[in-house]
Swiss-Prot record:
Cellular component annotations (GO), alphabetically ordered: cytoplasm
Name of the gene this protein is made from: murA
Protein name, UniProt field: UDP-N-acetylglucosamine 1-carboxyvinyltransferase
Residues recorded as bearing 2-(S-cysteinyl)pyruvic acid O-phosphothioketal in the entry: C126
Gene source species: Rhizobium johnstonii (strain DSM 114642 / LMG 32736 / 3841) (Rhizobium leguminosarum bv. viciae)
UniProt keyword terms in alphabetical order: Cell cycle, Cell division, Cell shape, Cell wall biogenesis/degradation, Cytoplasm, Peptidoglycan synthesis, Pyruvate, Transferase
Record GO biological process: cell division; cell wall organization; peptidoglycan biosynthetic process; regulation of cell shape; UDP-N-acetylgalactosamine biosynthetic process
Length: 430
C-alpha cells in the first residue's frame, strides 16, 4: 500500500494546472446511458473513480474509447473520452460494483428512463454518515416509477409507456438526487419541475451537456429546474468544467505553506465563498485570464469561522482542508459541518501533528498553534487525506500519510503538482 512522504517548511511557487471536476465527470459519464449515439467528453480527469465508473458503464454496454495523448499536450493530462451505448445489455448494477463507488448508484435514473426497468444495488461507499437514498427513491416515484427493495437491491419499474413528468420538491438539497432526477426526467412524458434542487456548478454542467444532447432543461443553477421531456437524446461533445474542490485545495495549500502560485484552467467564480474565506484568513487572491493567482505574505494566518452549506455556501468538500489551515491561525476558529454527520475523522489525525482541536456536536473548535510537527498519520477518506498533506506542508520535519488510495480517488497527480512548486512530496510504494 502506497504512502506519501512530506517534508514540511518549503513555500510553494509556480503554476499548478487544475484538472476536470470529478464531481461533474461522473454524472456526465452516466448520462451516456441515455442515448444510443456517442457522447464525447473533454477534460476528463485521470482518477481511480473515473476508471472504475468506465468499467461499471462497460458492464451496461457502454463502449469507451480514450483518445491518445497529443503532441504539445505538455502539462495538461486531461483526456478526451468517447462513450457509446448502442444498446443497454444489462439493467442490473451489482452490489460488487455499487459498493465500491456510490456514484455508480446514479445509473438508476438513465436505465429506468431508457429501458423502463432496472435492478440497482443499494450503495455502500465512502464512510460519511448515512447518506440516505430515500431522496432518489421519492424523486423517481414522483415520475411514476414503482420502487421495491429486495435483498439489498432496488427493483425499479417505469409505467407502461415510460416515466411521466411531475412536480417534486426535495425535502433537503441533494446533489446526487438532483442529477438522477434530471437525467430521468429528460426522457419522461410531459414536464417535470424539481423544487429545492441542488445549485452546484456540476449540476449546471450536467444540464448544459444534456441540453447539447437535445434535452430541454431550464433553471439549472437555481433552486427550481424545469425539464420538458423529449422522446430521445442524441450524442454531443462537452468539456467537463474545472474542479473547484481541487482549486480550493491547492489555494489552501498555498495559504498554509506561503508562496505565490497560479492555478491554471479554473475559474474563481466556481468557489466565491471559499475564496472570500481565504481572503479573510490572509491570502491574496486575484483572477487571471484562465484561472487565479494566490499569494500569502508573511503576516500569518487569521482565524475565520465557517459553516458548510450547499452551494453557494462553503463546500463540505473543502472543510477538512480549511481546518488544516486553521490549525496554524493566530487565534481560535470554529468549523461547523451541516452536510455530513461524521465528517470529522481527520481531527484525531491532525492532533497527531500537534493541532489543538476539540469537538462539540457538529462544531470543531480549533486553537491555532505556533508550529506543527511531522508524524505518521492515516487518511480516512478522500478530503481528510488531502487535509493531512496540507498540514504536512507546514509541519516541521517529516509527515507520512498512509492509505493514500483515498487521495487517488479525487486528486490527479497530487505529488507531482506540488513538487513542481517546490514542495518535498513523494510517493513511497511498498
Amino acid at each position: 500500500m502506497d504512502r506519501i512522504r512530506i517534508v514540511g517548511g518549503n513555500e510553494l511557487n509556480g503554476i499548478i494546472p487544475i484538472s476536470g471536476a470529478k464531481n461533474a465527470a461522473l454524472p456526465l459519464m452516466i448520462a451516456s446511458l441515455l442515448t444510443s449515439d456517442t457522447l464525447t467528453l473533454e477534460n476528463v480527469p485521470h482518477l481511480a473513480d473515473v476508471e472504475l465508473l468506465m468499467r461499471i458503464l462497460g458492464n451496461h454496454g457502454v463502449d469507451v474509447a480514450v483518445n491518445g495523448r497529443r503532441e504539445r499536450q505538455e502539462d495538461s493530462y486531461s483526456r478526451t473520452i468517447h462513450f457509446t451505448c448502442r444498446t443497454i445489455v444489462d439493467t442490473t448494477a451489482s452490489y460488487e460494483l455499487v459498493s465500491k463507488m456510490r456514484a455508480s448508484f446514479w445509473v438508476i435514473g438513465p436505465l429506468l428512463a431508457r429501458e423502463g426497468h432496472c435492478r440497482v444495488s443499494l450503495p455502500g461507499g465512502c464512510a460519511i454518515g448515512t447518506r440516505p437514498v430515500d431522496l432518489f427513491i421519492e424523486g423517481l416515484t414522483a415520475l411514476g416509477a414503482t420502487m421495491e427493495i429486495d435483498a439489498g437491491y432496488i427493483n425499479a419499474k417505469a409505467p407502461a409507456g415510460g416515466l411521466i413528468g411531475a412536480r417534486y420538491t426535495f425535502p433537503k438539497v441533494s446533489v446526487g438526487a438532483t442529477h438522477v432526477m434530471m437525467m430521468a426526467a429528460t426522457l419522461a412524458r410531459g414536464t417535470t419541475v424539481i423544487g429545492n434542487a441542488a445549485r452546484e456548478p456540476e449540476v449546471v454542467d450536467l444540464a448544459n451537456c444534456l441540453n447539447a444532447m437535445g434535452a430541454k432543461i431550464t433553471g439549472a443553477g437555481t433552486a427550481t429546474i424545469t425539464i420538458e421531456g423529449v422522446t430521445s437524446l442524441s450524442g454531443a461533445r462537452h468539456r467537463v468544467l474545472p474542479d473547484r474542490i481541487e482549486t480550493g485545495t491547492y489555494a489552501m495549500a498555498v495559504a498554509m505553506a506561503g508562496g505565490d502560485v497560479v492555478l491554471e484552467n479554473t475559474d474563481v467564480a466556481l468557489l466565491e465563498t471559499a475564496v472570500e474565506t481565504l481572503r479573510r484568513a490572509g491570502a491574496e487572491i486575484s483572477s487571471t485570464n484562465n484561472g487565479m493567482r494566490i499569494k500569502r505574505n508573511g503576516a500569518g494566518i487569521r482565524p475565520v469561522d465557517i459553516v458548510t452549506d450547499p452551494f453557494p455556501g462553503f463546500p463540505t468538500d473543502l472543510q477538512a482542508q480549511f481546518m488544516a489551515l486553521m490549525t496554524r491561525s493566530s487565534g481560535v476558529s470554529h468549523v461547523t459541518e451541516t452536510i455530513f454527520e461524521n465528517r470529522f475523522m481527520h481531527v484525531q489525525e491532525l492532533a497527531r501533528l500537534g493541532a489543538r482541536i476539540s469537538l462539540s456536536g457538529q462544531t470543531a473548535k480549533i486553537e491555532g498553534v505556533q508550529r506543527l510537527r511531522g508524524a505518521p498519520v492515516m487518511a480516512t477518506d478522500l478530503r481528510a487525506s488531502v487535509s493531512l498533506v496540507i498540514a504536512g506542508l507546514a509541519a516541521e520535519g517529516e509527515t507520512t500519510v498512509s492509505r493514500v488510495y483515498h487521495l487517488d480517488r479525487g486528486f490527479e497527480r497530487l505529488e507531482e503538482k506540488l513538487t513542481r512548486c517546490g514542495a518535498i512530496v513523494e510517493r513511497i510504494s511498498e
